[in-house]
Amino acid sequence: MKTILFILTFLLCENGYAQTTPSSKVFKPVELYQSNNLIVIQVSENAFVHTSYLQTNDFGNVPCNGMIVRNSNEAIVFDTPTNDSSANELIKFINEKLHCKVNAIVPTHFHSDCLGGLAAFHKQNIPSFANFSTIELTKVNNVVNPQNGFKDDLKLSLGKTFAMVNYFGQGHTKDNVVGYFPSENILFGGCLIKELDATKGYLGDANVGAWSNTVEKIKKQYPNLKIVIPGHGAIGGSELLDYTIQLFKAN
């Protein structure tokens, strides 16, 4: 089942979303790593999607996306794999195959598909950064706490460039943030952004009434995105923002 899910996701990326890098070369997504627990796909010159799996009662074995961005042998990871074992696998891949040191891990909200492997990053002395609300919610839910908090926006140095973390408002959860890689105009939307044709998914901690408005703010801030990575499913472009806005608009 995992392999089938991967192939479907990869083919959608391969056939539908070849992207243009800053050097104007067409970049087609390519699989760099696959095991039973982890997949890594390169989606641009310096951005990668990592996918791990979360067993759930309501939705089965769910593939969960995160993002890696790199520059000058440094990397930042958005969302951990779903457990410590897969997180260690990812860190090893980044160190040994991408030849990068991980500067930071950023969980984009408090659910386990974002920080289930956080302890593995801490054990390897990789600092974590999260919305203050995320830190409070991890304390309430008795899970591993991110180490460093911020309120609305955070700029993280990455080699000769940087990555941004932004809070635009409530949606999937009240604490959800997004990651943005300006040098390649890539957004990691996490669970706030849906793949095309997705259902609304888990709404147990959601603010459905605010969701569309929050995504509209993202679209206004970043109107010309080249790649958008959702928390689950296939990557795309700004049409994923449009789809998510319409999905949660009040009837």
Show the residue positions of the predicted features.
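Conserved beta-strand hairpin/beta-sheet module of binuclear metal-dependent hydrolase folds
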Residues: Q42-I91, V178-C191
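Bacterial Sec-dependent N-terminal signal peptides
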Residues: M1-T21
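Divalent metal-coordination and catalytic microenvironments
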Residues: N46, V69, D79, I94, ...
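Solvent-exposed, polar/charged alpha-helical surfaces in well-ordered, non-transmembrane soluble domains
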Residues: N88, K92, E96, A119, ...
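Sec-dependent signal peptide cleavage junction
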Residues: G16-S35
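Metallo-beta-lactamase
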Residues: S35-N37, Q42, E74-A75, T82-N83, F129-Y243, ...
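Active-site metal-binding motif and surrounding structural segment of the metallo-beta-lactamase
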Residues: S72-I76, S85-F129
